[in-house]
Amino acid sequence: MSKPKIYIDGQAGTTGLQIVQRLSQRDDIDLLMLADEDRHNEQARKQMMDQADLIFLCLPDAAAVEAAGWIGPDKKVIDTSTAHRTKWTYGFSELDPALKEEIKTTARLANPGCHASGAISMIYPLAKAGLLKEDALLPIFSLTGYSGGGKKMIADYENAKEEEMNSPALYALGLGHKHIPEITKICGLKKAPVFIPIVDDYRQGMLTSLQLDQDSFVKPVSKDEILKVYQLAYQDAALVEVHTDSPAKLYSNTKAGKDSLEIFVNGNDDQFIISARFDNLGKGACGAALQNMNLMLGLDEKEGLIL
């Protein structure tokens, strides 16, 4: 049986480069590579797409939309941009068994955003269980390493001379972050969350927190009841761990270099903080993309992942 042929369009970007490095170490796929001088050659890119069984689009949104239009329906595509996240099959298999089966058969998959992965991992189980009020205010803070901003932000931080770049920075304060639409749609929310991302002076790792109180729920709940919702939701998830004992302090870079995600539940009788910790380049990008590729190709979903 021949190995599946994989082509990465956008192999020099942050996510594309990570995928290239990871797939180069595997012997169960055939990685198709363009010479550096051909990376912007449209004809050469199309020829690679024609040869491939599965194509990763690791491009800016507009370029991803254009490239997707070149690809025939018989080819499998994983788009890592935001362009198709509210339109194509959403690549978060742990959310629902039916979604996992859809991922296995789809030809068009949108890889989740990094911040969105954390937010959705926390909101979706509560919404699915019918516990959240339709008009609940959902404040979310999400702390990321600077690699989440791509090559330019990486260069800015690693060559920084300004002292202020040594401290955390809130951004997207206009409340229009590009991950909000997918969070809202995938979780079935009628009101968009109040989402504040924060970038800090470390390379990779992400910690996303959701703040809730009793007014967020349709009925009174306890911390243990909330914990049980997550335990049930992720009981068969190989890449999601729900902690029964949550520490009072969480570091955001603990999962750097890993492809799994952790859920923590903290709080008291009235207020709760749910946290998701993972690597923005792992379960938040490359790791999720490889997991989805494995599922779409009929392979073990954990193949080549770092847990």
Summary of predicted features, one role per range:
Residues 1-166, 171, 266-268:
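N-terminal Rossmann-like NAD(P) cofactor-binding subdomain of oxidoreductases
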Residues 81, 199, 279:
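Anionic group-transfer/hydrolysis microenvironments
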Residues 154-159, 166-199:
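Anionic-ligand binding region
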Residues 194-201, 242-248:
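Short catalytic/ligand-gating loop segments at beta-alpha or beta-beta junctions
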Residues 211-307:
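C-terminal active-site/capping subdomain that shapes the small-molecule cofactor and substrate pocket
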